[in-house]
Amino acid sequence: MEKIYVIYWSMSGNTQAMAEAIAKGINDSGKEAEVQYVSEASVSELQDAKVFALGCPAMGAEVLEEGEMEPFVSEVEGIAAGKKIALFGSYGWGDGQWMRDWEERMSGCGAAIINGAGLICHETPDDAMISECENLGKQIAAE
């Protein structure tokens, strides 16, 4: 069975909880989710993937985490054309600008953003947000 990759970076565990809920939605749909922390992931694994998910919280002045996730996303830009990508992440301040920038960046590389926008969560995901994440996983599995 083809794996659907859910790759994320998390500091506080909020984005990790979102990744795990997205994976549950994928698995509940009869597909196989492969959840990986970004340091364990390889862009080559995504080369042949039609669909995958990337997650990262807002950092600093509403940017992606710069040590591991930013370099990974820069590599993904080279293979993004024609892919369907779900974006997700949590934030503690600001208004989600980091996600809008990320959506624009991936779209600019030729990727289609699932739902047309990333899924963002303010602080810790509550039950309603976990349910939204599971639903996103089901949408990813249906692509």
Regions found by a protein language model. Name each.
Residues 2-4, 14-17, 21-38, 48-143:
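FMN-binding flavodoxin-like domain, especially the glycine-rich phosphate-binding loop
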Residues 9-13:
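Short polar catalytic/cofactor-binding loops
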Residues 42:
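N-terminal helical hairpins
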